Every structure is written in C-alpha cells, then in structure tokens.
C-alpha cells in the first residue's frame, strides 16, 4: 500500500521519477546485496562512478549488467575529482560510457570533510551546462552558493545533510531549512550524511524533494532491509509534508475540548 498518490512525482529537468529515493551503488558487500537493495528501495535513479566501472576487476565484471537488468535510470557522478578540468573530463567520459547527459557533479575541496569546492563547483557547473549536461551539483547548504549554481544553469541542487559517510543526519537544520524556504521552486535533494530512515523522513517533512543514499544502506548489517526502510521513511515524510503538519506550540493545548457538563451528569442521575 502506498502512502502517496501516483500523481506526486519527482520532476528533474522535465523528466518525472516515481520514486524520490536516489541510491548509490558503492561499497556493498556483494553484487547480490546491491541488487537486492535496488529491488527493495525501487529508486528513481542510481548513481554510478565512472572510475569504479573503468577499474572494475573480475569480481565487478557484472556490475553494469546488473544495473541494466534493473532498468533504473543512471546518474553518473564525478566522485574523487578535485579540479575543474578533472571534473569536466570525467563527466564527458561518463557521457560516452553510460550514454546519458545526466551528471552528478562532485568537486571536493577538502580531503578531511569531503566538503565541495564552492568556487570550482560553480565554474565546472557552468562549463558542463554549456556542454549540454543536466547537472546536479553536490553542494553545501550555503544559500549564496546555491544561487550562483542556479545562475550557472543548474535546475536542481543536491545540498548535503552532513559530510559524506558520517551518518550524522542534518548537522545544520537551520541552514538547510532556510535554503528550502528561500528556494521554494527549486528541486532540492539532500545528499550525504543521512544515517537512518528517520533522518530521511525529517528532511522530507521539511519539504525537500528527495534524498540520495549510499553508505547508510551499503554499510548496514542488512542493506536490503535498510533500503526498504529508507524508502518507507521517505514516503512517510513526503506524506506528512503534503498533509500539512500542525504548528508547534510552547504551551499545552487540550486535544479534547471541554464544553458544558460531563456526559454522565446530563441525564440527571448524578448529583
């Protein structure tokens, strides 16, 4: 049973996706585990790193074939790139290998936090948009950088919740919620740092359009079960957002209004 209407779909660059979950494909214990997780999450897209595919050994020989069998749209990424030239070249190679003009643009500026390089990210995004790519940039919750990426031609953004692989959940709720509030018409997909389904549910309740998951699923004890749990959490959060949650209050407010006399006094049988 689904919580949402089939009409409530994620739209990116004019293309609709039935699921608001995007799933990464790295670091699973086995290809079977990856396959089971994709089947459980039923993601709208799966991300794939060009370098992984090019460097795949015998154990990974069936990786691309597995993705084809699931028939899920691919979102190549530029993971590991640290310069503009490297990111642009990797994106162009990925377009040839995976036969898609979609690209998740990653340009890392710090090896410790894996924080994006904001200046290089904007320039690389502009170059790739000009080259015909549909660019989904991995960025922080910085509103000014987000606007510059939109000015560069990006139509959707992928702000982090926390540094990649930390599983901390959203570390700056204020900044992320301000980003959502100030860019109400821009598709925003929270990427990185989510650790458990409640984290995903939370950002969906705030009105974000989707989440991208990898480590939280692939490093779980049971990835398939976690993938399904995340998908359910995303659906629940989206449904709650669409339902219009009540406003939080500082003081208690009775849920049952008291009007007149108790019902057992109304028949006159009690003094």
Swiss-Prot record:
<comment type="subunit">
    <text>Homotetramer. Forms heterodimers with either ThiH or ThiS.</text>
</comment>
<dbReference type="InterPro" id="IPR008867">
    <property type="entry name" value="ThiG"/>
</dbReference>
<comment type="pathway">
    <text>Cofactor biosynthesis; thiamine diphosphate biosynthesis.</text>
</comment>
<dbReference type="GO" id="GO:0009229">
    <property type="term" value="P:thiamine diphosphate biosynthetic process"/>
</dbReference>
<dbReference type="GO" id="GO:0005737">
    <property type="term" value="C:cytoplasm"/>
</dbReference>
<comment type="similarity">
    <text>Belongs to the ThiG family.</text>
</comment>
<dbReference type="Pfam" id="PF05690">
    <property type="entry name" value="ThiG"/>
</dbReference>
<feature type="binding site">
    <location>
        <begin position="192"/>
        <end position="193"/>
    </location>
    <ligand>
        <name>1-deoxy-D-xylulose 5-phosphate</name>
    </ligand>
</feature>
<comment type="function">
    <text>Catalyzes the rearrangement of 1-deoxy-D-xylulose 5-phosphate (DXP) to produce the thiazole phosphate moiety of thiamine. Sulfur is provided by the thiocarboxylate moiety of the carrier protein ThiS. In vitro, sulfur can be provided by H(2)S.</text>
</comment>
<keyword id="KW-0808">Transferase</keyword>
<feature type="binding site">
    <location>
        <begin position="214"/>
        <end position="215"/>
    </location>
    <ligand>
        <name>1-deoxy-D-xylulose 5-phosphate</name>
    </ligand>
</feature>
<keyword id="KW-0963">Cytoplasm</keyword>
<protein>
    <recommendedName>
        <fullName>Thiazole synthase</fullName>
        <ecNumber>2.8.1.10</ecNumber>
    </recommendedName>
</protein>
<feature type="binding site">
    <location>
        <position position="165"/>
    </location>
    <ligand>
        <name>1-deoxy-D-xylulose 5-phosphate</name>
    </ligand>
</feature>
<feature type="active site" description="Schiff-base intermediate with DXP">
    <location>
        <position position="104"/>
    </location>
</feature>
<dbReference type="InterPro" id="IPR013785">
    <property type="entry name" value="Aldolase_TIM"/>
</dbReference>
<keyword id="KW-0784">Thiamine biosynthesis</keyword>
<dbReference type="GO" id="GO:1990107">
    <property type="term" value="F:thiazole synthase activity"/>
</dbReference>
<dbReference type="InterPro" id="IPR033983">
    <property type="entry name" value="Thiazole_synthase_ThiG"/>
</dbReference>
<keyword id="KW-0704">Schiff base</keyword>
């Amino acid at each position: 049973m689904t919580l949402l209407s089939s009409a409530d779909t994620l739209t990116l660059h004019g293309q609709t996706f039935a699921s608001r979950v995007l799933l990464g494909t790295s670091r699973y214990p086995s290809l079977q585990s990856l396959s089971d997780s994709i089947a459980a999450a039923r993601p709208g897209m799966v991300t794939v790193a060009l370098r992984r595919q090019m460097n795949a050994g015998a154990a990974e020989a069936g990786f691309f074939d597995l993705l084809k069998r699931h028939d899920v749209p691919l979102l190549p990424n530029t993971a590991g790139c640290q310069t503009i030239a490297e990111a642009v070249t990797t994106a162009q190679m990925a377009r040839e290998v995976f036969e898609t003009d979609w690209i998740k643009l990653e340009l890392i500026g710090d090896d410790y936090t894996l924080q994006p390089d904001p200046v290089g990210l904007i320039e690389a995004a502009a170059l790739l948009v000009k080259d015909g790519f549909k660019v989904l940039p991995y960025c922080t919750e910085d509103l000014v950088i987000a606007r510059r990426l939109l000015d560069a031609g990006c139509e959707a953004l992928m702000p982090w919740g926390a540094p990649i692989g930390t599983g901390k959940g959203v570390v700056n709720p204020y900044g992320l919620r301000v980003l959502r509030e100030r860019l109400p018409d821009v598709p925003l997909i929270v990427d990185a740092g989510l650790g458990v389904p409640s984290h995903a549910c939370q950002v969906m309740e705030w009105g974000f359009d989707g989440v991208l998951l990898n480590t939280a699923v692939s490093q779980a004890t049971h990835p398939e079960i976690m993938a399904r749990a995340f998908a359910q959490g995303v659906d629940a959060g989206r449904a709650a957002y669409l339902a219009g949650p009540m406003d939080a209050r500082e003081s208690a407010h009775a849920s049952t209004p008291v009007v007149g006399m108790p019902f057992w006094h109304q028949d006159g049988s009690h003094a």
